[in-house]
Design a protein with these regions (language model features):
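Residue-level recognition of beta-strand->loop/alpha-helix junctions
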Residues: 74-76, 141-142, 191
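Substrate-gating cap/lid alpha-helix
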Residues: 147-192
Length: 226
């Protein structure tokens, strides 16, 4: 009889320990997001040549989250590569603290002489910096360049004077995008956005409708975290 009581009590203690252990590790409610920073290039920028750009995804997100008390900042400029973004992210984080930082970068690197490895290394440095400041790093792969970048819309430039040269750079960007999930450590990877090629005029920049798709994709997660 005593032995039965002993086993019953022992079982109850064991169940209680398991319950509180599970509750401790899985029952915690995540801290709400109170501040977000977006860093990137022209796809992310909220101004161009000193003039505001209202159609890009950070502004769409800001218009929804700011009234809810969430601080939304942006460090982005057209034509900039990952080295510039890394430098300016460092400066921003010296005087500002964020709960979450989104990185959307690399296309200007891939359409220049910067290697895939160097661009990925810069993004990893951003991730490590963000984590050291107590924020959550998110790396955005971006639209699916394979389908979004309509080769008929890719225009040669003074630096890349042929269509074949532009297609080669497009393929380099696809390779860079595909490398992100395995190359970048310690960050949440945001998968490719399904934006049709009809939502771009130059095969690089999404139209306002395309920007809305990006914003809505990110807001789905953000809404659950505020």
């Amino acid at each position: 009889m005593n032995k039965k009581i002993f086993y019953t009590v022992t079982s109850l203690i064991g169940i209680t320990i398991i319950y509180f252990t599970v509750k401790k590790f899985f029952g915690k409610k995540a801290q709400p997001i109170g501040s977000v920073l977006f860093v990137g290039d022209s796809i992310t920028a909220i101004e161009s040549s000193g003039k505001p750009v209202t159609s890009t995804y950070p502004n769409i997100i800001k218009s929804e989250l700011s009234p809810k008390g969430v601080k939304v900042d942006v460090v982005a400029q057209g034509g900039k590569r990952t080295d510039w973004i890394l430098t300016n992210l460092k400066e921003k984080l010296k005087t500002n603290k964020y709960d979450r930082v989104y990185i959307y970068a690399g296309i200007n690197d891939m359409f220049s002489s910067v290697s895939i490895e160097s661009a990925l290394q810069n993004i990893q440095k951003m991730v490590d910096l963000i984590k050291s400041k107590g924020a959550e790093p998110y790396v955005i792969i971006g639209y699916d360049a394979k389908t979004f970048m309509d080769e008929n819309k890719l225009k040669p430039t003074s630096y890349v004077p042929t269509k074949a040269g532009m297609v080669k750079l497009k393929n380099r960007y696809i390779e860079f995008q595909n490398a992100i999930p395995n190359a970048i450590k310690g960050a949440t990877i945001v998968g490719k956005f399904n934006i049709p090629s009809s939502m771009t005029g130059d095969a690089i920049h999404p139209t306002p409708s395309g920007q809305k798709i990006i914003a809505e994709s990110l807001l789905k997660d953000l809404r659950m975290s505020i």
